[in-house]
């Protein structure tokens, strides 16, 4: 029997086809990560040293707020304010506090936005950076208050402001109170306009919902990272509402640039220099 098997001309090996999920998840993620942009595994350290951009296909990975601040603000110059805000549950929404506490533990942040001021190549600026890992960067009363305070601080101190958006929109657990933040932040921006102070809006993936419908699209200059999802409602909801097929690439930064809704698309690796040039141009 064994002799017959060994002398057989038939293949003694079986090729096992690994499914896509196994291929993507079978590599130790401490050293490697799977890139959806180029369908390949990439050394994690190479991505981190490349501003969290894939060195093969230039796909921009999501960033937590402090990592983005480290990329944009001069080392040692960032001063945070309003980091110790207290939790608010205006509607007494069930289990809302428990959910917020879990995200605090996960992200080591108090809320979905980090605010403060620092310097970009020596130029002082106020900066707000939203954290998409904290309840999808949703805007509730605390996020709205922190952004409003930052805008007012910039106006009072004659400083420019940069807001980096990354959000799923208004926070549903706060209902109408979260929607009020849209008007609150938008109204605050008028104080900058009165003093001719620049507001630079940086859109990152994703920027949607109430954030898009308020301060994110009100910048004097609106910049986006490549291939960023920007919109109010999702494409499926829109198609079901209007009973029409949306154009290819709808709600991407490239589509919005073509239609004139944003001013420029900037690679993350060049973002700090572009922001510096804009700030230097408008420096008083």
Curated annotation (Swiss-Prot):
Cofactor: Zn(2+)
One GO term describing the cellular component: acetyl-CoA carboxylase complex
Signal sequence residues: none
S-S bonds: none
Record Gene3D superfamilies: 2-enoyl-CoA Hydratase, Chain A, domain 1
Record's keyword terms, sorted: ATP-binding, Cytoplasm, Fatty acid biosynthesis, Fatty acid metabolism, Lipid biosynthesis, Lipid metabolism, Metal-binding, Nucleotide-binding, Transferase, Zinc, Zinc-finger
Subunit structure of this chain's protein: Acetyl-CoA carboxylase is a heterohexamer composed of biotin carboxyl carrier protein (AccB), biotin carboxylase (AccC) and two subunits each of ACCase subunit alpha (AccA) and ACCase subunit beta (AccD).
Full protein name: Acetyl-coenzyme A carboxylase carboxyl transferase subunit beta
């Amino acid at each position: 029997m064994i002799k017959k098997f060994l002398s057989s001309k038939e293949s003694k090996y079986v090729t096992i086809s690994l499914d896509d999920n196994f291929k993507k998840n079978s590599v130790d993620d401490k050293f490697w990560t799977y890139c959806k942009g180029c369908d390949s595994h990439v050394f994690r350290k190479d991505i981190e040293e490349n501003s969290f951009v894939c060195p093969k296909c230039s796909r921009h990975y999501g960033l937590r707020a402090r990592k983005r601040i480290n990329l944009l603000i001069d080392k040692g110059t960032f001063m945070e304010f309003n980091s110790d805000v207290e939790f608010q549950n205006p509607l007494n929404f069930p289990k809302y506090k428990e959910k917020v506490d879990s995200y605090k533990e996960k992200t080591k942040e108090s809320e979905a936005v980090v605010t403060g001021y620092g310097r970009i190549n020596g130029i002082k600026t106020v900066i707000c950076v939203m954290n998409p890992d904290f309840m999808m960067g949703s805007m509730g009363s605390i996020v709205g208050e922190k952004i409003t305070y930052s805008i007012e601080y910039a106006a009072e101190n004659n400083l420019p402001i940069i807001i980096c958006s990354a959000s799923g929109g208004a926070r549903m657990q706060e209902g109408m109170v979260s929607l009020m933040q849209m008007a609150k932040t938008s109204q605050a921006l008028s104080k900058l306009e009165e003093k001719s102070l620049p507001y630079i809006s940086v859109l990152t993936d994703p920027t949607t919902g109430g954030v898009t419908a308020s301060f994110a699209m009100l910048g004097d200059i609106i910049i986006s990272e490549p291939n960023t999802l920007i919109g109010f409602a999702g494409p499926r909801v829109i198609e079901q509402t209007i009973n029409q097929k949306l154009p290819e690439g709808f709600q991407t930064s490239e589509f919005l640039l073509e239609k004139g809704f944003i001013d420029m698309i900037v690679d993350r690796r060049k973002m700090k220099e572009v922001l510096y040039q804009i700030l230097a141009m408008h420096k008083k």
